[in-house]
Structures are given as C-alpha cells and as structure tokens.
Amino acid sequence: MTENQQLTALVAACHWIGEKGWCPATGGNMSVRLDDAQCLITESGKDKGSLQTEDFLLVDIATNHVPSGRTPSAETGLHTLLYRREPTIGAVLHTHSVNATVLSRVEKGAELVLHGYEMQKSLAGQTTHLDRVVIPIFDNDQDIPALAQRVTEFASHTPLRYGFLVRGHGLYCWGATVKEARRHLEGLEFLFQCELQRRLLEAKA
C-alpha cells in the first residue's frame, strides 16, 4: 500500500473506533509504519472519532524525533518500541475501552488467559478455541520510558503477539496491516466482554 492508502485506512479505523466509544475524551493513540525508519502517529489531544490526515505526525522510529516540531501522543515511545522489536508490525492501535480497562484491573495477575472462545480465531495464527491466548498485563506508569522498559524486558523472553493490556489504562494491539490490527482489536474487545460477563455470572452463581 502507498503512504496515502495506509493513512486513509488508519483514519477510517480511528473513526470506527470513535463510533464504538473505545477512545473517549480524546484518549488513545494510533499509528502506522511507513518503512523501517518512520511511522505516522496521532497528534496529542485529538478526538479519535473526527481525525483527519493532517492530525498524524511523522515520527522517527529509532529516536522518537518529530520533524514537524508538533506534539505527538505522550505514548509514542510504546509505538516505536513495538516497531523496533517486531518488524512484522505495520500498525498499532491503543484504545481505552471500558472492557479492557476494567478487565485489566479485575485480573490481578501478570496476564489474562483466554480459552474456549471461538472468537480466538480472529487473531492471526489461532486456529481453534482449544488453544490458550495469553495477553500480558503491565502495571500503569506515567513514566512512559519506564513502562516501555518493562515491555522490552518481557519481550526479551516472550514473543509479543496481538496485544497487551496496561492495568487500569487500556489495550495496545497491532497487526501486519491496519486491516489486521483492526480485526485483532475487534476480536479482543469481543473476547474481553465475554470474559467479563463469564466472571460476573460465575461470581453470582
């Protein structure tokens, strides 16, 4: 895809995310890789449901430098970290949905394990509900470099797949393309809602 096609796809994904209510109050951030050296990421403080192409900033993946001098998302470092570590990642979507935020707090451990759901097959490489889908959970931190370091340490021994949760904060998910990242986001949101409902019903039983 050309740069314009990639950006058009990402803008459409942002509008869809806004309609879903997954990034309220200008929260969240989205990006797309242009090549090995550069990505485009949302400018800070923009409503995701009404983004336009001019609301995305060019960022150097190696240094986080923004040639325009404008202010990118505060969490730019997590996007560029993912692009550096995983060359196959082509787009990153970070959302603040209720399901992701609450489930990341309800689950007290370091990971959320999903098992037995047909929708697991929405994730690349998943072929059966019998497998386990493991979503890491990292404690929230306003110090983004410190949070990025914890993600780096995790990734040094465990491959990053599909996404991770930041406790009380939201979901980071990705894909080889904007289209795949969007499918992963929709699939994970469905799975999170199912898991929350399951836990709620079991607690009442």
Curated annotation (Swiss-Prot):
Q: Name one GO cellular component term.
A: cytoplasm
Which cofactor does this sequence's record say it needs? Zn(2+)
Drop me one GO molecular function for this one: zinc ion binding
GO terms for biological process?
Answer: L-methionine salvage from methylthioadenosine; monosaccharide metabolic process
InterPro entries, from UniProt?
A: Aldolase_II/adducin_N, Aldolase_II/adducin_N_sf, MethylthioRu-1-P_deHdtase_MtnB
- E.C. number(s) listed in UniProt: 4.2.1.109
Pathway(s) it belongs to: Amino-acid biosynthesis; L-methionine biosynthesis via salvage pathway; L-methionine from S-methyl-5-thio-alpha-D-ribose 1-phosphate: step 2/6
What does the entry list as the binding residues for Zn(2+)? H94, H96
Q: Cofactor comment in the record? A: Binds 1 zinc ion per subunit.
Q: Which reaction does it catalyse?
A: 5-(methylsulfanyl)-D-ribulose 1-phosphate = 5-methylsulfanyl-2,3-dioxopentyl phosphate + H2O
| Swiss-Prot/TrEMBL keywords | Amino-acid biosynthesis, Lyase, Metal-binding, Methionine biosynthesis, Zinc
Q: Matching NCBIfam families, A to Z?
A: PRK09220.1 (NF006672), salvage_mtnB (TIGR03328)
Q: Matching PANTHER family, A to Z?
A: METHYLTHIORIBULOSE-1-PHOSPHATE DEHYDRATASE
> What's this chain's function?
Catalyzes the dehydration of methylthioribulose-1-phosphate (MTRu-1-P) into 2,3-diketo-5-methylthiopentyl-1-phosphate (DK-MTP-1-P).
For this chain, the family text in UniProt reads: Belongs to the aldolase class II family. MtnB subfamily.
What is the protein's given name?
A: Methylthioribulose-1-phosphate dehydratase
Organism whose genome encodes this protein = Pectobacterium atrosepticum (strain SCRI 1043 / ATCC BAA-672)
Q: Which gene encodes it?
A: mtnB
